């Protein structure tokens, strides 16, 4: 049948994993630089496309040919114009030259696929809150990369990895807190050994590390303007500032303050950014995270005391404020010790094994023999109908829900409608 791999197709970083000969998920490194995670940046050159850190480097000098965060555009009907260096809405426009999101995403998938050999199938992860249009575009990207693909939600993949760790103590109802570079998901699941039953998922498809970087850039811009009398030029379009902001954010996870020399229109200037300043700047996002935590608990009919463990996923969970939020609401610290950048890819590899049992050796089959996953529908699914209010003798179009959110999958629900 051929090998099946697991791919975490992230907003800012991506990763690929496969089962080793003993059935344990193994993250594959980029053969060019040995990196276990690959930056989801694409540079469109005259002769070929470049993916990864080299593409990000190119963004500093050639932004128009460098595409970042393509994942955030997957559900949109847009084209990246290398002439204008931005996404352009296709609606009402003809003959726009450029690249649609699925084409750019396929370049990343092709790069990752080459880390292994003989790969024709893959399990690709998507945010739990990804719209159907975005899921369809991801499938299109896989086809362009010559991959037969099945999708799995990112937090669901992550809990599979946690539950299948050697000697895992993960059990009972758990909360998966997945804060990455561009999206945020919370999933509550029941874990019994290697059996995972998803209960509910909530999230925000536009909340993640890139938004935090923007706030750091705003801090830098204000301080530069105060010191020099003139602000930076289009700071949120300057990729070199995002590189600096990302570095500041990472350092502030371990230190209270960091200094950087910022080049601007009035010359260089040393700027200090404190952890307190940074955390205050993202207060709106912090409140949204708290709200979604409360929503997940309410939807699952759980109190914090009913949750045995909170599991971290995604690079942005390294920020100290994340631990503070979880401690305050969940009344206990989150579980640490797993590589939060790789957990989703590893879970995808485990799920890939479930989809390819015929292609596994005896040790691999034994390793995943007790793995079981039961997921839910993350969205209300229905159809647009014309309904009549008999009391008011009025009619109108409404969205009639056929499958409620959090319905266990697979499911089959039948409703009868009359055609007018």
Where are these regions (language model features)?
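Structured alpha-helical segments in the cores of large, soluble enzyme domains
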Residues: 112-113
């Amino acid at each position: 049948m051929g090998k099946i791999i697991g791919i975490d197709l992230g907003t800012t970083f991506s990763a690929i994993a496969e089962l080793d000969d003993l059935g344990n998920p193994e993250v594959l490194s980029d053969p060019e630089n040995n990196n276990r995670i690959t930056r989801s940046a694409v540079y469109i050159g005259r002769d070929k496309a470049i993916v990864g850190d080299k593409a990000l480097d190119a963004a500093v000098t050639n932004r128009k040919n460098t595409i970042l965060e393509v994942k955030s555009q997957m559900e949109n009907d847009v084209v990246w114009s290398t002439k204008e260096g931005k996404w352009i809405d296709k609606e009402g426009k003809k003959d726009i030259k450029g690249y649609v999101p699925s084409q750019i995403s396929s370049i990343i998938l092709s790069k990752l696929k080459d880390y292994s050999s003989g790969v024709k199938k893959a399990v690709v992860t998507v945010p739990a809150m990804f719209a159907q249009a975005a899921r369809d575009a991801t499938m299109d990207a896989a086809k362009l990369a010559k991959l037969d693909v099945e999708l799995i939600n990112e937090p669901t993949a992550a809990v599979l990895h946690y539950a299948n760790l050697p000697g895992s103590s993960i059990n009972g109802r758990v909360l998966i807190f997945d804060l990455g570079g561009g999206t945020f998901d919370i999933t509550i699941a029941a874990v019994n050994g290697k059996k995972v039953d998803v209960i509910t998922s909530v999230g925000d498809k536009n909340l993640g590390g890139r938004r935090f970087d923007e706030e750091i850039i705003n801090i830098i811009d204000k301080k530069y303007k105060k010191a020099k009398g003139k602000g930076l030029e289009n700071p949120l379009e300057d990729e070199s500032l995002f590189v600096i902001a990302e570095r500041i954010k990472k350092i502030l996870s371990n230190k209270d303050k960091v200094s950087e020399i910022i080049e601007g229109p009035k010359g260089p200037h040393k700027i200090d950014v404190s952890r307190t300043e940074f955390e205050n700047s993202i207060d709106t996002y912090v409140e949204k995270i708290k709200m979604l935590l409360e929503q997940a608990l309410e939807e699952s009919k759980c109190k914090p005391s009913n949750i045995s463990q909170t599991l971290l996923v995604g690079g942005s969970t390294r920020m100290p404020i994340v631990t503070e939020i979880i401690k305050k609401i969940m009344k206990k610290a989150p579980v640490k010790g797993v590589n939060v950048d790789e957990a989703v890819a590893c879970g995808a590899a485990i799920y890939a094994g479930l989809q390819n049992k015929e292609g596994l050796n005896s040790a691999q089959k034994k390793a995943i023999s007790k793995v079981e996953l039961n997921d839910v529908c993350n969205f209300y699914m229905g159809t647009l109908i014309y309904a009549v209010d008999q009391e008011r003798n009025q009619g109108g179009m409404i969205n009639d829900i056929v499958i409620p959110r959090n319905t266990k999958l697979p499911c089959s629900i039948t409703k009868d409608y009359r055609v007018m």
